[in-house]
Amino acid sequence: MILEQYGITNFFKEQKIAATSSYGRVTAVFRDYYRVITENEEFLASLKRGNFYELSSTSLPTVGDFVEISGDLQILSVLERKTVFSRMNKDSAEQLIAANFDYALIVMSLNHDFNLNRLERYLTVAWDSGATPIIILTKADLVEDLSFYAQQLKAVAYGVPAYYVDNLSHHGFEALESDLKPNSTLILLGSSGVGKSSFINSLAGTNLMKTAGIREDDSKGKHTTTHREMHLLSNGWIVIDTPGMREFGVGFNQAGLETTFSDVEELAEGCRFHDCSHTQEPNCAVQAALEDGTLTMQHYENWLKLQREMAYHARKNSPALARQERDRWKVIQKSMRTHFKTRPKK
């Protein structure tokens, strides 16, 4: 019964474990230990080292994972995941953040934190995770006219539900809560100080999280969440909070990028050449859309930037691609410089 409240489904219960083991869910990750809840208790567990010695870091448990627990409180294995969110660190290694969530809530505040390029980056990793993305715009009480932001969102996140909320008055939460499925697991993504902790408190109906805020002078956030942790709310939702991430590297799974930039991908299907770089080739549908204003330069440049970032991480993990990708991007960058110099000003 307890694990059902914490989101276990037949997908996980049908994965076989030893008769002497039990199912558990990781609710927090610390340096050397994992906080795990089972049907009977919540405790700090360690890894059975022999079982994880030769596995990659992505095979280690993360918040939200369902795991096999031994009688002596050791994690024996990680069950197959339904969804997973990871980011690339500075060494181009994949770093797990959380697993097995139904919704990825991208939280941005309606001040200087509102950034379309960052939103597209978050949407890319959200789609790539396998979860359903939802945009949460906090501090809506500070904005008189929301139509400006609605138009901005329509340009880069068409079809993704967006909710304008005020954590103080609770405005906007009723619509959001009616659309979330009961007993769902939610992960919150966003920069420091955008109101993620206050949002959790509003969703929970109690002061569950410590809050800080954004400095008024520069709109920079202050960290209140220092580690990844799961919270079971009294209304049945399970929330995974993460430390604020203003910048993070995307991985090299093309699916999330194709979904976020589906408009550009659809345009690219109309190009004359199947291997079009969308920078200099004749009869390029993407360049034509740039010329007639159908596609904005900002959206296009962010698409190219994320494409290149994914290619970089792919090269780091597959050295054989390095020379091929380097030569290709030399051509693209040269043609982009030529395009920007010769493009008539409007």
What does each model-found stretch correspond to?
Residues 117-128:
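Histidine-anchored nucleotide/phosphate-binding helix
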Residues 196-212:
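A conserved segment at the C-terminal end of the G1
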Residues 106, 135-137:
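Structural beta-sheet core signal
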Residues 132, 139-194:
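Canonical P-loop GTPase G-domain recognition
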Residues 110-111, 139-140, 242-245:
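Conserved Walker B
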Residues 1-116:
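N-terminal accessory targeting/assembly segments
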Residues 56-66, 71-72, 80, 86-103, ...:
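Helix-rich effector regions associated with P-loop NTPase G domains
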